[in-house]
Regions:
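Glycine-centered flexibility sites
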Residues: 5-6, 79, 85, 104, ...
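C-terminal boundary and immediately downstream tail of ABC-type ATPase nucleotide-binding domains
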Residues: 92-114, 142
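ABC ATPase nucleotide-binding domains
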Residues: 1-98
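A generic structural signal for ordered secondary structure
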Residues: 17, 49, 67, 81-91, ...
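Non-catalytic connector elements of ABC transporters
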Residues: 106, 117-223
Length: 223
């Protein structure tokens, strides 16, 4: 009898645990499984590891798997370690552009630090003002797609004017792909703005906002 992919995974995990190893290496353990089976296998793995006292090293390109399973995270870029530390801390404060990309950030701009509290996001064509003191080591700014605040009417501080390039409607969200614009010229850089289903009706009633606002608390200042 040929075992299914899920059954093969269960047998392999059971054999590993039977040896009571000091270290377990899991290399993309769920990559070949469909979404439904993957969720069940992850639950089973968590249960199997509850009483395991050794170290588990998981290699994965899935940020959801890493966030769910790991307490500590190490990021390798082109053979070099760029970040290491507490997983949730790195997700919240990625420090480097590579880490921000791997933790799901989609929007980046090169920056010029103008003074201790002002920077120019050159790819977006805007100047941002912040209360915190900026370091000269900052080379990029990142902003997660779901954290933009839509603004209708009068422009506020740290807002991007934009025009719609395209959009994609998914089951629980809509992705708007927009191009920043200034009075002088249009930028070619595409920004992703993610809108959850709960906010769809507002946009359908009011139309697209005039601006997207960036809040300082959500800005990622990156090396």
């Amino acid at each position: 009898t040929q075992l299914s992919g899920g059954q093969q995974q269960r047998v392999a995990l059971a054999r590993i645990m039977a040896y009571q190893p000091d270290v377990i290496l899991l290399d993309e353990p769920f990559s070949a499984l469909d979404g439904y089976l993957k969720d069940h296998m992850q639950e089973e793995l968590i249960e199997m590891l509850e009483d395991y006292d050794g170290t588990v090293i998981m290699v994965s390109h899935s940020r959801d798997e890493i966030y769910r399973f790991s307490q500590r995270l190490l990021i390798i870029d082109r053979g070099e370690i760029t970040n290491h530390g507490d997983t949730k801390e790195i997700f919240d404060h990625p420090v480097t552009k590579t880490a921000a990309m791997l933790t799901g950030c989609k929007n980046f701009s090169d920056v010029k630090v103008l003074d201790a509290h002002t920077l120019e996001a050159t790819s977006w064509g805007i100047t941002l003002h912040v209360a915190c003191e900026l370091s000269d080591e900052i080379h990029y700014i990142g902003y997660r797609a779901h954290q933009f605040e839509p603004i209708w009417g009068e422009r506020e501080e740290n807002c991007i004017a934009f025009r719609l390039s395209s959009k994609a409607e998914l089951q629980f969200e809509r992705n708007f792909y927009v191009k920043p614009e200034t009075e002088a010229f249009h930028r070619d850089d595409i920004l992703t703005w993610l809108v959850q289903r709960a906010c769809w009706q507002t946009i359908e009633e009011k139309g697209l906002p005039d601006y997207l606002k960036l809040h300082e608390r959500d800005m990622l200042f990156l090396k």
